[in-house]
């Protein structure tokens, strides 16, 4: 009997081709589009993104073309609790969260996996650019063939159980190859642009979104320098992130950057670019893939944000919940709330949340 797999279909080219590839490999494929948007009226005008209403229609059309069943499932409550509420709270605390990482851990590879198993499926699959591998009885992830599209950074916190029940067929292809496959099999989404914005914030203005959702909780405060001198007024700490230069609304005659955010006093500290370069960080909520615990210092390549290049570093254990990361070269804007992720020979070692 063929193994059954539920493919999370966003209506984009990657998940559409993932469904096709798995069907070609002999799996019994079921397409599921996750309904996560919170306010139907607010999203009616969205033209793209995995939360848009048009994405549902695109996914349905692809499923029909591939001759596979397709369902739309409601994940609103879980998405609000684990992604949106977390996103807002982190910004209110002066941090810079990554909602895609939270969505992967709690929605796509947890809630969707549970629904998939309720349908009798053996696996859940996505269009992520990564490859699941089993090395020495442990599941881990290998970087995608297309390093420009590699998405392993956002998948470091998956559990062994989740990885054991996950398929990512796009990881062995380059993006242009995925688009070519879509063209060859007649999928209308072959030229659909990639979604780059935060899916639940269509205009990408996270500050305005948080202010609208939290109503009167976002307050104006002071910009200060390192000595505590007041430099001017800011719109609210949720509008700013470490290393930010644009959108400060002030002119000092020299390049000025956000070098710290103080949520308890509602202050944003400004300084020079030199002030945001550091070599050390501490990470919490750490998850390792090839092994359970770090038992001795380890040389790795580490990324402090999705778009950054991997940099040489040494990781060592501080206690049961935290690790220290020491980079060989100084890194720009190591930001609380973002994830630091580790690699060795293109294998994902693990990662954690930057705490200090």
From Swiss-Prot:
The family this protein is said to belong to: Belongs to the MnmA/TRMU family.
Cited InterPro entries: MnmA-like (IPR004506), MnmA-like_C (IPR046885), MnmA-like_central (IPR046884), MnmA-like_central_sf (IPR023382), Rossmann-like_a/b/a_fold (IPR014729)
One cellular-component annotation, GO: cytoplasm
Lineage of the species this protein comes from: Bacteria, Bacillati, Bacillota, Clostridia, Eubacteriales
Cystine pairs: 103-199
Annotated source species: Clostridium kluyveri (strain ATCC 8527 / DSM 555 / NBRC 12016 / NCIMB 10680 / K1)
Known catalytic reactions: S-sulfanyl-L-cysteinyl-[protein] + uridine(34) in tRNA + AH2 + ATP = 2-thiouridine(34) in tRNA + L-cysteinyl-[protein] + A + AMP + diphosphate + H(+)
Protein name: tRNA-specific 2-thiouridylase MnmA
Residues that coordinate or bind ATP: 8-15, 34, 127
NCBIfam families found in the cross-reference section: PRK00143.1, trmU
EC number: 2.8.1.13
Region (Interaction with tRNA): 149-151, 305-306
Subcellular location: Cytoplasm
Summary of the function given for this chain in its UniProt record: Catalyzes the 2-thiolation of uridine at the wobble position (U34) of tRNA, leading to the formation of s(2)U34.
UniProt keyword terms in alphabetical order: ATP-binding, Cytoplasm, Disulfide bond, Nucleotide-binding, RNA-binding, Transferase, tRNA processing, tRNA-binding
Interaction with tRNA (site feature) positions: 128, 338
Pfam families, sorted: tRNA_Me_trans (PF03054), tRNA_Me_trans_C (PF20258), tRNA_Me_trans_M (PF20259)
Gene3D superfamilies in UniProt: Adenine nucleotide alpha hydrolases-like domains, HUPs, Translation factors
Single Gene Ontology MF annotation: tRNA binding
GO-annotated biological processes: tRNA wobble position uridine thiolation
PANTHER family linked: MITOCHONDRIAL TRNA-SPECIFIC 2-THIOURIDYLASE 1, TRNA 5-METHYLAMINOMETHYL-2-THIOURIDYLATE -METHYLTRANSFERASE
Annotated catalytic residues: 103, 199
Domain of life, per lineage: Bacteria
